[in-house]
Structure formats: C-alpha cells, structure tokens
Amino acid sequence: MAAGMYLEHYLDSIENLPFELQRNFQLMRDLDQRTEDLKSEIDKLATEYISNARTLSSEEKLGLLKQIQEAYGKCKEFGDDKVQLAMQTYEMVDKHIRRLDTDLARFEADLKEKQIESSDYDSSSSKGKKKGRAQKEKKAARARSKGKNSDEEAPKTAQKKLKLVRTSTEYGMPSVTFGNVHPSDVLDMPVDPNEPTYCLCHQVSYGEMIGCDNPDCSIEWFHFACVGLTTKPRGKWFCPRCSQERKKK
C-alpha cells in the first residue's frame, strides 16, 4: 500500500476523534461544575448545622446530616463518572496510537520489500549491462586482432579459402600482417569461443602469420614467434611437423 493510502486511511479513522474528545472533555467539565455546586451546597448545610446546632432538634440535625451525606454521595458518583470518562478518553486515543504504530510497521515492511525488489532489479540490470559490455569488448578485440587495414584478412582453416599467404614463388604473395601484437596481449583479450585457433600454440590469429606450403597441413597457419621466425623466409616454407614428415620420406 502506498504511503498516501496509509495516511488517507489513518486520517479517515481519526476524523471523528476531535469531536469525541471534545464531547468527553465537555462532560468532564459538566461533572466538575456539578461537583462544585454540590460542594457549595454541602458548605451551606454544614454552616447551618454548626450555627444552629444548639437550637436544632434531633430530627432537624439528622435531616441536615442526611442532606450533607447525600451531597457527598453525589460528589462521589460524579467523581467516578469523571474517572470513567477519563479512562474512556485515554483508551480512545491509545487505540488510534496503536493503529498508527501498526500502519507504520506495515508501511516500513512494504518499503523494505520494495527496496529489495529494486535492488534485485538493479543487480540483474547491472549484470545485463556488464554482459553487453563484455560482448562489445570481445567484438572489439576480434576487430583489433584482424588488423587496421580493411584489405588484410585472417586465414580460415575450415574451408581453406584464404590461403593468401605462401612464401613460395608459386604464389608470390607476402605473408599477411596483423599489426604488432604479442602473444601476451592476445591472451589478455576476450576471445570468442567460436573463433578458430591456429598454430602449434592453438591460439587465435594475431600478429604476423605464415602459411605452410604443404597443402595437406592440418594446422596450415603459424605465428612467426611460435616457429622461430622474425622475417618472411624466401622460397617455400614448411611447418616443423610437415618438415619432419618430408624428412621421413
């Protein structure tokens, strides 16, 4: 329930409270006034009794004493009624205070529940944003690893369509250069799990790479650093595995 609803319901419940309090206070004032009137009457009766004690007969004395006793009895009744009204007024106010405390407790519980829901939503939203940023970083890393020049293309071993770089004179093409990227830099980059790997190190394409001139080479592309090259060799070049196979033949 919204705070406005709690406040509205509480204000509705105490709408008649001022009138009820005013009525009880007015009744207590009336009782006070009636008690004061009786006290004045008692004083007069007592004065009459004392002043005329010697001249009054026994019956007259008993009559005055009876009137004084009845007046005191009335005062006691008025006092009891006043106490009852005071207790009723206290309970009336206390009831509204307890209801206010209950409504406040419910309102605080609702606030905590909404804060928890808001925290869960912010957490899931933050995770979604982090996931989106991670995906963007992966795409950016792949774009960086493929080089700055649009005409430079990474090798694709799946269909062997991009055997663009061979060191042999038969193809006469220079090796593809992907920029000055070191293996440690690539290892720190986010990697797409679907991106193919190459070389003896089974890493993605980066830096300068060279293709094996054996058309049946299972790996096909190698990083310069992994095969001990610093520059492109002249003539045909075979990877270490293919070189060993050729020596066996």
Curated annotation (Swiss-Prot):
Zn(2+) 1 binds at C199, C201, H223, C226. Its main location: nucleus. Keywords: Cell cycle, Chromatin regulator, Coiled coil, Metal-binding, Nucleus, Tumor suppressor, Zinc, Zinc-finger. It is found in: Nucleus. One of its GO terms (biological process) is positive regulation of apoptotic process. GO terms for cellular component: nucleus. A zinc finger (PHD-type) spans 196-245. The keyword Zinc-finger applies. Zn(2+) 2 binds at C212, C217, C239, C242. The keyword Cell cycle applies. One of its GO terms (molecular function) is methylated histone binding. InterPro entries: ING_fam, ING_N_histone-binding, Zinc_finger_PHD-type_CS, Znf_FYVE_PHD, Znf_PHD, Znf_PHD-finger, Znf_RING/FYVE/PHD. It comes from the Eukaryota. The record marks Y198, M209, D213, W221 as: Histone H3K4me3 binding. Residues 25-118 form a coiled coil. Residues 115-160 are annotated as: Disordered. PANTHER family: INHIBITOR OF GROWTH PROTEIN (PTHR10333), INHIBITOR OF GROWTH PROTEIN 4 (PTHR10333:SF106). Component of HBO1 complexes, which specifically mediate acetylation of histone H3 at 'Lys-14' (H3K14ac), and have reduced activity toward histone H4. Through chromatin acetylation it may function in DNA replication. Homodimer. Component of the HBO1 complex. The PHD-type zinc finger mediates the binding to H3K4me3. Belongs to the ING family. This is Inhibitor of growth protein 4. The lineage of its organism: Eukaryota, Metazoa, Chordata, Craniata, Vertebrata. The gene is ING4.
